[in-house]
Amino acid sequence: MSTEQFSEKYYGVVGMSGMSVRQGDTAIAHGSGDVPVLATPQVIALAERATIAALLESMEQGQTSVGIRVEFDHISAASIGAEVRAIATCTKVEN
């Protein structure tokens, strides 16, 4: 498969992942803060699960994907019991 065909196959695919925030998901539990809200490492893991969901159906046996950059903004805290979701869209393919 050419680089162009590879890019066309994955560009624009979308995946989603969701979770309910539990005690073990908090900044306190992860040692990344002192408030009982969703920890940043958990936010990144949620985003990675959305990325996997986006690419999984398009990948062939033996293929995988790795993240090379993470950029996000905290726009609101998520307390225990909150339902949160991540949506991933493939906007660039690098080989």
Cite the ranges covered by each PLM segment:
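Short coil/turn motifs at secondary-structure junctions
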Residues: 24, 52, 91-95
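Catalytic strand-loop segment that frames the active site of acyl-thioester-processing enzymes
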Residues: 2-38
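HotDog/MaoC-like acyl-thioester-processing domains
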Residues: 12, 79-80, 87-95
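Hydrophobic beta-strand-centered segment that forms part of the acyl-chain substrate-binding groove
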Residues: 51-85
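A short mixed-secondary-structure module that forms the rim of ligand-binding clefts
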Residues: 39-43
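Residue-level recognition of well-ordered beta-strand positions that form the cores
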Residues: 18-20, 71-73, 87-89
